[in-house]
Design a protein with these regions (language model features):
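Acidic, glycine/proline-rich low-complexity segments that act as flexible tails and inter-domain linkers
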Residues: 1-76, 130-148
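N-terminal alpha-helical segment
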Residues: 60, 78-80, 96, 113
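Short alpha-helix boundary/capping elements
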Residues: 56, 85-92, 124-125
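Amphipathic alpha-helical segments within well-ordered protein domains
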Residues: 65-68, 82, 100-104, 117-118
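Short, structured motif recognition centered on aromatic/hydrophobic residues
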Residues: 77-86, 116-120
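Extended intrinsically disordered, low-complexity coil regions enriched in Ser, Thr, Gly, Ala
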Residues: 92-115, 129-140
Length: 148
């Protein structure tokens, strides 16, 4: 993988165009994260680097370019699967919040998100599921109040 790199302020290396990748995974990843974070595509790289550093940001953007774009699953289904995975994983509430919004944007309903967390209690335990449903409900309330 070749990187477009120039010298930036203070001698820091700055990625100009992101990595050169096979196909358009980079661009699709930027689009996916722009949608998830509700920011312009041109701001995704800096935003991600601020969150997780350059190495992880690059991997996440390229990976998202493949994971969120194919014809096997709808965006709604993918969103519900990701919400379920994050609830099951536990301890990733900050990552769960934007995925709740994204699931709604992709066609899931508030009732489906709450039912998903309730079902997960049987499989991942009540502690993780209850934290998950708490985050889901908080995010639903926040989004509802933002719409008013």
């Amino acid at each position: 993988m070749t990187l477009g790199v120039t010298s930036g302020r203070g001698g820091h290396r700055v990625r100009v165009n992101g990595p050169v990748t096979k196909g358009d995974r980079w661009q699709r990843g930027l689009a996916a994260y722009a949608s998830q974070f509700a920011i312009p595509e041109e701001d995704v790289w800096d935003h991600m680097c601020g969150l997780v550093g350059e190495r992880m940001a690059e991997e996440a953007i390229v990976t998202a370019g493949a994971a969120w774009v194919d014809d096997c699953l709808s965006l709604r289904d993918r969103s519900l699967i990701v919400v379920a995975a994050l609830v099951a994983q536990g301890g990733v509430e900050a990552r769960l919040r934007p995925h709740v919004r994204w699931a709604l944007e992709h066609g899931a309903t508030a009732d489906e998100l709450e039912a998903l967390a309730t079902l997960l209690a049987v499989y991942v335990g009540f502690a993780r599921a209850s934290v998950g449903i708490q985050v889901i409900r908080e995010e639903l309330a926040r989004l509802e109040s933002a719409d008013e």
